[in-house]
Amino acid sequence: MKNELPYEKTGNAIKGYVESVIAKSESRDCVVRAFASSFDVSYDFAHKYVADEFGRKPRKGTYGTVAKLVNMSDNLIKVNGKKICPLGVRHNDYMLRSLMYDVTVKGVTKKRNMTVGTFVKQNPKGTFFVLVKGHAFTIKDGIVIGNPEDATKTKRPMRCAFEIK
């Protein structure tokens, strides 16, 4: 497809994903997979870390991800020697809808939410933990790691993003 981004299969991108017994029985684990691929840790380590630090219940999804990542950034917490840097404008203690940019249409400047496609164009290099409505995935050097449809839905508005350095 024309607007499709490069995609890497989860099994190739995450250490120990194919062999993991936990991964085979999990669902709604997008935050765990994004965490594992962003920080270059194994799936099982990421699963335990997200359960302990983010309060994730098995097969139930992860809630409050943005607040937890902002807290990790504020407290300078590193995982696997890597730190988190929030991108965009910070609104008090949350980062939702922080990635806005100006667009001039017919002489009028308006703010627009950044889409996944625009974000990749503006950030071709680096590792990013990306959150869209109800979902999380990783973008590494312009390559999407997550679900296959994450690479095809380039017009999807982003909620927020964190650079992993």
Report residues per predicted region.
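Noncatalytic regulatory segments and standalone regulatory/sensor domains
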Residues: 143-165
